[in-house]
Amino acid sequence: MKTKLVIFGITGDLSRRKLLPALKEIVQSGEFEDLSIVGVSRRDGNVAELVETATNSELLTNLTTIFTMDLARAEDYVRLRNYLDLQPDEQALMYLSVPPSAAASIVDFIGQAGLNTPHIKLLFEKPFGFDLASAEDFIARTGRYFKEDQIYRIDHYMAKEVAAEVIRLRTIDDGARQWGNESIASVEIIASEKIGIEDRANFYEETGALRDFIQGHLMQLLSLVLMDLSPPFTIDNLAERRLKALSQIQVADPTKAIRAQYEGYQAEVSNIGSTTETFASVGLTSQDERWSGVDLRLTTGKNLDKKQSAIIIRYKDGTEHVFDEATIASTDMKLPEAYERVLVEAIRGRKYIFTTSPEILRSWEIVTPVQKAWEMDDTPLSLYVPGTKTEEIL
């Protein structure tokens, strides 16, 4: 099937840094000769300048056109529909590389213009809501015009090597397939960075580490570890197994959560007295009898001593199994970059690495008690020096 990829926000930072370079690799692979790209922009743009600056790819430049429109005008979406002129053998992927505050209204306009036929798919970046209530509202709004199987919610951590390696091992190794409390003492998932917030002051001040990483990325990775893989299991029901695992996790206890902020953060965001956490760690438990008694912990932070994305399985015999992105990426088994893989799977209609509505809502339910406690300042906010080790904060 021919594919038209429509990118809302093609001139933005994410598009230049991630999407266009990923598309360069895809078109150069030769596997998707029937792919064309339509970049939606509020102002006229030079295709060659935009694409070649980001990718230095003449091939991608030739496959890309710019459609200029006002994102707040309903009639412009009708113009877009007519411009795309989708045929029975074509599909359209609507990639919303836009701020979350704009996404819901764009979806409304797209649906109202009739751009919601079965061969049209929506691709969203996180965050999927600011809290449980806003997530429920956003899911309800997208559901007015689009069915769940048309909606592809992107958590790029699910397309990274760590997630792929866990899935691979758990589906081929009998021991990993039967992970549980008989052999495992604890599971720790860590995403640490050496950098601070850089140029994301406004976003981070509104979001914080709990919302930015734990509610989404790390909770999804945890579900891969905890999910039941008893037959009949196929990769296509992966989301169903992830959700079942999430449903067994008890809502988080604020007394088992830690928040901290690196020294200098308040000056960076020009908000002296800010209580936004740049480090968050949440201890969890599962009601699943296979995981009863196993300590679960999700940890993330900025301005720490090292960059690490890892899942650490600690066994009762004192050994451990570490799924570390840096180690996996150094092998010959390296996968395509996350955004490249996301786009390829969306084109092919394979949804197993995308996050479903029920998963999003359950993840929010789990972290809500911690979120509310931190908003009420019921939990101390400690400070740490940039370059601190994770274990020194825990």
PLM features per residue range, with description:
Residues M1-L123, F128-L394:
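Secretory/organelle targeting and membrane-embedding segments
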